[in-house]
Amino acid sequence: YEMQRSLVGSEMCIRDRSPEVQKACDAMNNYLKASITYKMTNQNMVVNKDLISGWVTYDDNMNATLDESKVKEWLREFGKTYDTVGTTRSITTPGGKTVDVSGGTYGWSVDEAAELTALVDSIKKGEVVEKEPAYAQTAATHDAQDWGTTYLEVDIPAQHMWYVVNGAVQLETDVVTGLPTPERETPTGVYSILEMKRDKTLVGEINPSTGQPSYRTKVGYWMRVTWTGIGFHDATWNPSFGGSRYQTNGSHGCINMPLDQAASLYGMLSMGTPVIIHN
């Protein structure tokens, strides 16, 4: 019934000249004046009268209202289309290997709650605007590889990492990643550098039998990737890096680096730099 009323609204405006109907028509016509163009990657997404007319309803007193639940539903689909956090992306290593990587915390994420408020406000004011949506989180670019051209990359099977700046490799080294067990493997996905600290003590999970941390290790250069304790750091206790060492003497999930390389990387790196870890 409500939907029918919203669809016949424009005809009603022509047929019925009563003050109540005219008031509803004025409100609806104001809504339908709105045109919000979201400037997205490959195409613009436009919210105009074609969409808005389906979101306007009338109550028994002929008050025209915007059904925010329908706007919210549309924004949820909009977010699904343009959010990239956790999605599958493709990367080609400096060595020429192309792999898919999914998961992680890095990428675009539309702030649907904030955008709902903004969109409803624009429609009610009958605004004509071009904009980007509100984002809860942004990435370097809207390209398919949204981390851009400056990033850290870790190839677990190759036990090798690269620091790429503006498309050119600035540093590369063999590494030791997590022991390949469910508890200790290095997580794959697209992340970013969350914290950088000198002379940090890494503390393992509490061992239930002793009540003590499973390890307490001091490192000179700490570059955090996840809040669950994964990061890049120097590992002076490792006699060698690369090869198959990780399969028997792997870390607890961190990316272990030679001291000189960890120091060099720390000196070059910026907070927020994207990190791609893949098999």
Regions found by a protein language model. Name each.
Residues Y1-I14:
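Single conserved hydrophobic/aromatic residue that forms the stacking wall/gate
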Residues K33, G86, W147-T149, I156-A158, ...:
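Extracytoplasmic
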Residues V56-T65, V101-V110, W147-T150, S209-T210, ...:
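Second-shell loop/turn segments in exported
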Residues K70-E73, E77-S102, G107-E115:
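Extended, domain-scale alpha-helical bundle/helix-rich regions
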Residues E73, G204-N279:
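Exported/periplasmic cell-wall-interacting domains
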Residues G103-E183:
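Cell wall/extracellular polymer interaction/catalysis modules
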Residues E153-V154, W162-V164, L171-T173, S192-E195, ...:
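Structural recognition of the beta-strand scaffold that forms the well-ordered cores
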Residues A158-M161, V169-Q170, L179-P182, K197-T201, ...:
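Solvent-exposed loop/turn segments at secondary-structure junctions
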